From Swiss-Prot:
Compartment list: Plastid, Chloroplast
Protein name: Small ribosomal subunit protein uS7cz/uS7cy
Superkingdom of origin: Eukaryota
One Gene Ontology term of the molecular function aspect: mRNA binding
Keywords: Chloroplast, Plastid, Ribonucleoprotein, Ribosomal protein, RNA-binding, rRNA-binding
GO biological process, any: translation
Gene: rps7-A
Organism: Oryza sativa subsp. japonica (Rice)
GO cellular component: chloroplast; plastid; ribosome; small ribosomal subunit
């Protein structure tokens, strides 16, 4: 344990075009092997496709999708004294929920059939903003699991 004071949290930087922190968070999750410019290209192409599909502000669609996918409650695996594991429901904070939502959106878009990542990501974001798609199903499955194990909430 550190003897110094706690490290101060750094705020996420905003991206150069939209001046938005959320966009930068998504770009950092898309990025593989440090190729940030490629991640920016993928996201900007996806944003352009969203603009063409919905004819609304694509940042609003992105925010709406992330808001819809963000979970309120999740499950954490705990082992009891006898050695059996249980999935204990836990509350999820706003930052962790947003990070999970972005991760689920990207996982769901990668699983989609399609031409390229920008196309798949744009489709997933539009579907999530409307209340459908793989990421929404993942959130609902997590909520169902937490609801089923509600009796174990005192284990934390």
């Amino acid at each position: 344990m550190s003897r110094r004071g706690t490290a101060e949290k750094r705020t996420a930087k905003s991206d150069p075009i939209f001046r938005n922190r959320l966009v930068n968070m998504v770009v950092n999750r898309i990025m593989k092997d440090g190729k940030k410019s490629l991640a920016y290209q993928i996201l900007y192409r996806a944003v352009k496709k969203i603009q063409q599909k919905t004819e609304t502000n694509p940042l609003l669609v992105l925010r709406q999708a992330i808001r819809r996918v963000t979970p309120n409650i999740g499950v954490k695996t705990r082992r009891n004294k006898k050695g059996s594991t249980r999935k204990v429901p836990i509350e999820i904070g706003s930052k962790q929920g947003r990070a999970l939502a972005i991760r689920w959106l990207l996982e769901a878009s990668q699983k989609r059939p399609g031409r390229n990542m920008a196309f798949k990501l744009s489709s997933e974001l539009v579907d999530a903003a409307k209340g459908g798609g793989g990421a929404i199903r993942k959130k609902e499955a997590t909520h169902r699991m937490a609801e089923a194990n509600r009796a174990l909430a005192h284990f934390r």
